[in-house]
Amino acid sequence: QAIKQGLETVKEEGALPKVVDIGAAGTAMRFLTALFAATPHLEVFLTGSERMQERPIGALVEALRQLGADIIYAKNEGFPPLRIRGKQLAGGTISLPADISSQYVSALLMIASTTLQGVSLQLVGKVASAPYIKMTIEVMKSFGVEARWEGERIGVEAGQHYTRNCPYVV
């Protein structure tokens, strides 16, 4: 519901609200953190329920910072809420613990093609929920963005663009 409201705001007014409250939606917190960080000229306070503010997001924020993101913890280090100043990210090579959450990996992959250099993501440790990462890569491909997963590394080249020509109907 929170994402729907945010998207409706974008559609109606052309800009996101200054405060985005995702409630208890953990997936939305992870994906929107990456999306907002990679959206130039966007300043957002991303928050959620009291319980959401107890759920760690530090590994994702650190990975995004390595790509050049401007993200500040508004309360407690490693946890939402977040102050995000979006910009085009530099990209590059980053390492991420693979046993935390496949959603961190998916969030990074989905914004990787928008970076200046692309992203080479080195997964460290046993991969959590590999089928979800594979699903992310397949959906990205359906929308025109290719990722290559070889061993513990996933690469996404810069300059690829998501397209509307895909087999999905919403």
Language model feature labels by segment:
Residues Q1-V170:
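Structural preference for solvent-exposed beta-strand-turn elements
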